[in-house]
A protein has these predicted regions:
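Conserved donor NDP-sugar-binding/catalytic core segment of glycosyltransferases
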Residues: 107-143
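Acidic donor-binding segment of Leloir-type glycosyltransferases
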Residues: 26-69
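Active-site nucleotide-sugar/metal-binding loop of Leloir-type enzymes
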Residues: 82-94
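A short, glycine-/small-residue-rich helix N-cap motif at loop->alpha-helix starts
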Residues: 73-80
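Conserved nucleotide-sugar donor-binding
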Residues: 153-167
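N-proximal low-complexity "stem/linker" segments adjacent to membrane-targeting elements
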Residues: 1-27, 35
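Short beta-strand-to-loop acidic/aromatic patch adjacent to the donor-nucleotide binding site
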Residues: 92-103
Length: 167
């Protein structure tokens, strides 16, 4: 069964990206794509922080199937994130997306993979979302729930290339 790629969308927060990478290390996803937006003009600290963020990608050392999309100039979240998702969906049928400040619970990748496979052929479902407001030290609690909603939210998102968002 083909692995579903992980897409990490990052910018200028290397410490947050490192935390996400370390949380991914527990499940070691075999296919990882990372998109890093460029520094903003007129923000003196951005070039250094963006450079450190790009360097942090090297911590993904559990797989050789890592590719990066590096923007030299800043596109902003409203353009960089959709460009990153399109970049991955040009190669794969679906993707699990994380922003750089996400920290995953141990079951999320399995949940997302199962959800993508189960709902992949339903045109009325555009994405599956994971969000947990439980404090970080409680994430090891084995009690996990899922619910369906018509309103998308933040957190980890699992996207399908063939879904019709207007359905």
């Amino acid at each position: 069964m083909e692995s579903i790629p992980i897409l990490i969308i990052a910018f200028n927060r290397p410490d947050r990206l490192i935390n996400l990478i370390e949380s991914l290390r527990a499940t070691k996803p075999p296919v990882v794509r990372v998109a890093v937006d460029g520094p903003r003009v007129g923000r003196p600290g951005d070039p250094r922080r963006v450079s450190e963020t790009r360097a942090a990608v090297q911590r993904i050392d559990w797989t050789s199937d890592v590719a990066t999309l590096i923007h030299d100039t800043n596109l902003g979240c409203e353009r960089a994130a959709p460009a990153a998702v399109s970049w991955v969906l040009n190669e794969f049928e679906s993707v699990i997306v994380f922003e750089d400040d996400a920290v995953l619970g141990p079951q999320f990748i399995e949940f997302a993979t199962r959800a993508l496979r189960e709902f992949n052929y339903r045109n009325d479902i555009f994405h599956v979302n994971g969000y947990n407001v439980v404090p970080h030290d409680m994430l090891t609690n084995p009690a996990a729930t899922a619910r369906l909603s018509r309103v998308p939210g933040g957190g980890g998102a699992c996207l399908f290339s063939g879904a019709d968002p207007g359905a």
